[in-house]
């Protein structure tokens, strides 16, 4: 279910303060995967936490409106069963 239009997009207040205070080229670490990407974020690099480490995400114009968490996957695909060492 999508967020109501009357509420507007969500972004953590602390994250927005970090973005305005950040210098160019600085990686902004965040645990807020639920925050919406705003146009003010374009050209900045965020370190988005995936539960284990911070994944660097460079924000481009196409990403505006999406959530930060969409670009830092939390699960690693190990692949389907291989036939390693199995001989016919």
Swiss-Prot record:
This protein's UniProt keywords: Ribonucleoprotein, Ribosomal protein, RNA-binding, rRNA-binding
Pfam families the record matches: Ribosomal_S19
GO cellular component: cytoplasm; small ribosomal subunit
MF terms (GO), sorted A to Z: rRNA binding; structural constituent of ribosome
Domain of life: Bacteria
GO biological process: ribosomal small subunit assembly; translation
Gene3D superfamilies attached to this UniProt entry: 30s Ribosomal Protein S19, Chain A
Membership in a protein family: Belongs to the universal ribosomal protein uS19 family.
Function per UniProt: Protein S19 forms a complex with S13 that binds strongly to the 16S ribosomal RNA.
Name this polypeptide is given: Small ribosomal subunit protein uS19
Species of origin: Mycoplasma mycoides subsp. mycoides SC (strain CCUG 32753 / NCTC 10114 / PG1)
Classification of source organism: Bacteria, Bacillati, Mycoplasmatota, Mollicutes, Mycoplasmataceae
Gene name as annotated: rpsS
